[in-house]
Amino acid sequence: MQIGIAGLGRMGAAIAARLIEVGHTLTVWNRSPDKAKPLETAGAALARSPGELAGKVETVITILTDAAAIEAVYDGPSGLLSGDVAGKLFIEMSTVQPQTEIDLARRVRAKGAGLVECPVGGTVGPARQGKLIGLMGPRTAMPCAPSRSSSNSAAGSSTSDRSATAP
């Protein structure tokens, strides 16, 4: 499975390092490209934009600062949703309000892609060791979960699933 990560802060970088360590093919992007250099040295490919990242992988993990960052990274002119993303899976791990996830899910689904929320419990150390606790939506996100987390629960419907038909 080809995985991409957008957002290489402390948690994103730790998750990316773990995925590389266990053998996943990884492409990464960050607003500050220098944060990606250690991951490139470790074997990750670098994307020049979120849109390029989404074009190269099957699954995109996002772990971003806030709702404004989510909007910029997903919806900007070269954002994750700027190209053809039909059939791709987005795993959203940012700590944001439920309405942000609901709105994002609508935009992602309108492009023919899937989105699952996956809030995590833990810090950088457990992330680096693959010992985060991940709570995710549908089981479709489970194939890459063991690399990130020691405890994974498919929680059934997510906030964005339950609200997909809301006005």
Kindly label every feature range from the protein language model.
Residues 7, 35-38, 69-72, 92, ...:
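Residue-level recognition of specific faces of alpha-helices
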Residues 31-32, 66, 139:
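Residues in the short beta-alpha loop(s) of Rossmann-like NAD(P)-binding domains
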Residues 41-44, 61-63, 108, 130-134:
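Short low-complexity, flexible loop/linker segments enriched in glycine and/or proline
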Residues 95-167:
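Rossmann-fold dinucleotide-binding core
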